[in-house]
């Protein structure tokens, strides 16, 4: 299945973009959007901003997200994904990156509309505290499914993606875990694999996997990465 030939819009994104197209007030949707549309598309932002510039990263995430997702949890959760990617590219260790990710939560969520959503940072902190007790992928996957949740809410899916990424530390392993987990598997997998890929690099993914994705979706991953790398040198707010 070609990913570009199916509807990739979630409920919040669809509602706000339709309002845009009709010239209506789209903020009545963005101020209430608790879903994961911002987080699922944010990884490239983590490629553009240095890992140690939290304010710039959070502000960039907010500006990119607010057209469809303007809440504290959506922006904060997306910033955590972007920060994990930025930290991976920046050569931080997994342990250092976890601290970076937790730190940016408060910086970023202050830029969104306040909501009643659960703290993604505290849910991620919980995952970090228990993952060392697991030595079986299926059991950890079940813990994520039962405790963090794998639904479309940012508080569930971003927490799940971060947990999977920091547990697996491998894009291929994370992809397999997410595909078998249940729930919003493609979104969680996209975020988790982007994070792992930032640490591992493209060559860590078996050629059979990457070539299948490129052929099926008519993509050239190396060319896309080169474009992002060039944009990194010229990007500014």
Model-found features: residue ranges?
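Structured, active/binding-site neighborhoods that engage oxygen-rich ligands
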Residues: 1-237
């Amino acid at each position: 299945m070609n990913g570009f030939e199916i509807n990739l819009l979630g409920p919040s994104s669809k509602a706000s973009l339709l309002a845009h197209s009709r010239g209506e007030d789209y903020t009545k949707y963005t101020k209430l959007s608790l879903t994961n549309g911002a987080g699922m598309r944010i990884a490239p932002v983590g490629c553009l901003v240095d890992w140690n510039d939290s304010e710039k990263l959070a502000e960039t995430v907010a500006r990119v997200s607010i057209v469809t997702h303007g809440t504290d949890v959506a922006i904060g959760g997306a910033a955590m994904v972007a920060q994990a990617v930025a930290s991976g590219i920046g050569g931080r260790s997994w342990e250092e990156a976890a601290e970076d990710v937790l730190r940016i939560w408060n910086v970023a969520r202050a830029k969104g509309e306040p909501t009643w959503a659960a703290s993604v940072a505290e849910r991620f902190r919980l995952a970090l505290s228990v993952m060392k007790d697991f030595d079986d992928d299926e059991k950890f996957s079940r813990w994520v499914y039962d405790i963090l949740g794998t639904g479309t809410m940012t508080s569930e899916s971003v927490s799940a993606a971060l947990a999977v990424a920091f547990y697996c530390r491998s894009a291929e392993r994370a992809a397999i875990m997410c595909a078998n987990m249940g729930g919003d598997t493609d979104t969680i997998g996209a975020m988790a694999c982007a994070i792992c890929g930032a640490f591992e690099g493209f060559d860590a993914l078996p050629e059979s996997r990457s070539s299948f994705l490129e052929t099926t979706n008519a993509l050239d991953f190396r060319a896309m990465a080169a474009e992002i790398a060039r944009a990194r040198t010229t990007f500014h707010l």
